[in-house]
Regions:
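Short, acidic (Asp/Glu-rich) active-site segment that either coordinates a divalent metal cofactor
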Residues: 40-43, 142-193
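Short, surface-exposed beta-edge/turn micro-motifs
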Residues: 27, 150-151, 249-252
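Short, well-ordered amphipathic alpha-helical segments that serve as non-catalytic structural scaffolds
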Residues: 62-74, 104-105
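Extreme N-terminal cap/leader segments of soluble proteins
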Residues: 1-58, 77, 82, 86, ...
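Glycine-/charge-enriched secondary-structure boundary and capping motifs
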Residues: 1-12, 37, 57, 91-117, ...
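Short alpha-helix capping/helix-loop boundary micro-motifs
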Residues: 137-141
Length: 306
């Protein structure tokens, strides 16, 4: 590795990650996946003033949050992580923050059992982290597998990240528990594999909001969903409407055949997390989401380009 600020930055990243990035050094990474499994790949961007503001979070939190968001896409597919690549755009004055930023990425990747296998560093006007994650799954869970009669389940409780974001945008200090859910989401990797083993046949992670992502799943599956907003588990102090619209939850919405052996009490004992039935797949063709019979309009969630 040569001399200069760029290579000094890369060396600093490698020192921070240690053995977790031991394979970095060639022009490309070479990964092995278990025989009979399929490669699952996703890329996720975290951009300053779009996904976060620097005054809201520490550098370590920014790195960890970006890694968790990317790994959540593997969770949605029921995949086991096998590699992470980080492309960093660094603004002037941020070199001193690289070590905690890298530590945040590394801590979350390590908790997922995911090695860091490569990346890139470049100058940028604003901080950005583009993370590519790779995983493997014997039978990936698509968005497109929901069928009429399936039961729709969600993991976790909703509304914390949205409540934290509203407080931050208003210049207020968020409730500590809400802030923790906003800055330190947990990708539901183990939970997704358990759900897949127990019959889940369609899944999506909740990044844009529950209604928005339910609509994505319905459209991919060519079905309509009937959800009961009264059943949606909300964090204390958050309305159902706000919980439905709250993005960046990184919980899972899954479709499960009625004959499945999934038991919510068994799931909660295993993971310390609620699993709640919130609706059913009602019909093929229309690709709509209804709340007790009424179309779910006005609860669209986040749209990057609107």
């Amino acid at each position: 590795m040569g001399a200069g600020a760029e290579f000094d930055a890369i060396r600093g990243l490698l020192v921070t990650w240690g053995a977790q990035a031991a394979g970095i050094g060639d022009d490309a990474a070479v990964l092995a996946i278990p025989a009979g499994e399929r490669l699952v790949v996703s890329t996720d961007a975290s951009v300053e003033n779009v996904h976060f503001r620097r005054e809201w979070m520490t550098a370590e939190e920014i790195g960890g949050r970006a890694a968790a968001a990317a790994l959540s896409d593997l969770a949605a597919m029921g995949a086991t992580p096998c590699g992470l690549l980080l492309a960093l755009g660094i603004p002037k004055g941020w070199l001193s923050e690289l070590e905690p930023l890298a530590r945040g990425v590394g801590t979350v990747a390590a908790s997922a059992g995911c090695p860091i296998v490569g990346g890139n560093v470049s100058a940028a006007g604003e901080l950005s982290l583009t993370i590519t994650v790779l995983g493997s799954a014997g039978q990936p869970i698509p968005r497109s597998g929901a069928r009429q009669g399936d039961i729709m389940f969600v993991t976790g409780r909703f509304g914390g990240p949205g409540a934290a974001l509203r407080a931050l945008l208003a210049g207020r200090q968020p409730v500590a528990a809400h802030r923790a859910r906003f800055v330190a989401p947990v990708p539901r990797l183990r939970e997704a594999r358990w759900l897949a083993e127990h019959g889940a046949r369609a899944a999506i992670d909740i990044s844009d909001g529950l209604v928005a992502d339910a609509s994505h799943l319905a459209r991919a599956s060519g079905v309509s969903l009937s959800l009961d907003e009264r059943a949606v588990p909300c964090v204390p102090g958050v309305s159902v409407e706000d919980a439905f619209a709250s993005g960046e939850e990184y919980e899972l919405l899954v479709a499960v055949p009625p004959a499945s052996d999934i038991r919510a009490d068994e799931f909660e004992r295993e993971f310390g997390l609620p699993l709640t039935a919130i609706g059913v797949v009602i019909a093929p063709g229309a690709s709509a989401v209804t709340l007790r019979g009424s179309l779910a309009v006005g609860l669209r969630g986040y749209d990057h380009l609107s």
